[in-house]
Amino acid sequence: MRRQNSKIKIKNLGFTLIELLVVISIIGILASLTLVSYTGAQKQTRDTQRRSDLNQYRNALENYAGANNGLYPAGLDSMAALCGADNPLDTAFIASCPVDPLNAGGYVYGFFSSATGDAYLIYGGLETGGFWEICSNGKSGKVAVEPSSSACGL
């Protein structure tokens, strides 16, 4: 009788194939959910960096205006013109022009200024959709359509 009891105990110590498959499936589902949320968090982090970069540009432009009778660089229609070879925001106003965290096309910063230099608009594409816009009138926020002039869309 003792032998039969020991055989039964040995058989009950292992897991069935079904139990193992259920556990592996649950682990796979949890891993995929974690990966999806991690990717979303990375996008939000880069979008936060973009908003911070645009605020650096805002500060530099406001400092520029403070040193130039309240006027911003006039008639510019791109970030390349603002931060290019003829950089009106020289090192006195901004140490270096921030670039998009991904440094890959699609998510870039844009800049428009009025012909008279009394208004500007800076913006950046967001990975979570839309564009973050900062206007010379102090407004900032998310817009759905990419800006095409210095007119504030907020």
Language-model region placement:
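Aliphatic-rich helix starts adjacent to a transmembrane/signal segment
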Residues: 35-55
